Amino acid sequence: DDIISLGVGEPDFSTPWIIREEAFYHMEKGQTSYTSNWGLAELREEIAKYLARYNMSYSPKSEILVTVGVSEAVDAVLRSILNPGDEIIVCEPCYVSYQPLAQLCDVKLVHLDTSVNGFYPTASQIEDAITEKTKAIMLCSPSNPTGRMIPADELEKIAGVIKKHQIWCLSDEVYCELVYDGHKHVSIGSFPGMKDYTIVLNGFSKAFAMTGWRIGFIACSEELMAQIYKLHQYSTICAPIMSQFGAAEGLRNGWSEVEKMRVSYQQRRNLMYKAFNEMGLPT
């Protein structure tokens, strides 16, 4: 009873009121039906604006798909791009779902140990891991579970390797708003030529404290999205409409609440960092 678990990525904040209120409003109006398989148009438009903040351009009509959380997004993408016998590079340690979802596709997992380099993958490591059977690499920056960000200069080198070998890059960016000490998130999809190879995966669980709302999204090229859409359409149909309305309002007007939570997380992180150092633990 005296042990505090830090093992689950679950914000201890309630979803900001502005988001809950928006969802309540639409439920009270009786808007409780299916949405388009793509997701609400207003949400996709807000997502496109959001991605533009990170120097990425995606059409809300054909290159952005709303999903039931990022976990569904990962599953749908892997089943769209992988064939039995393919290889996928997974940077470890990693989010617990990556490997099982890849294994369900009957592919070979190539494990990349990032602990040898400060818990982020390097371009040279990735280059060495690529074979003629490599179909994709799974990146997560900031990392779950380590929190480590891939430095922008290294990320640019990784982009070069990906373009050279023409493999897919699944970029899980669900923690991108929770960065500290003045750092800014950089998406691998923002580098020249990377839109053709990058599949951006993101959602609202972490930044907006919306884990139970199950709302995420995929952004990628139109050609690939046409295939991912089919899997989504016939498996989950759409994310809950009230979650979509809430997420759209979060993107429009919820950023001050996100910042309050981020500041609190940074204060907690600093406290843990100080305590670990005082105990002589490596940080």
Regions found by a protein language model. Give the residues of each.
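N-terminal small-domain helix-loop-helix segment of the aminotransferase-like
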Residues: 1-69, 76, 250-253, 266, ...
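PLP-dependent aminotransferase class I/II
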Residues: 16, 197-283
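Short acidic capping loops at alpha-helix termini that bridge into adjacent secondary structure
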Residues: 58-64, 84-87, 133, 195-198
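Conserved PLP-anchoring active-site segment centered on the Schiff-base-forming lysine
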Residues: 80-102
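A short helix-loop-beta submotif of the ANL/AMP-binding
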Residues: 103-109
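Helix C-cap/helix->beta junction micro-motif
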Residues: 105, 164-165, 279
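Active-site phosphate-binding strand-loop segment of PLP-dependent enzymes
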Residues: 114-181
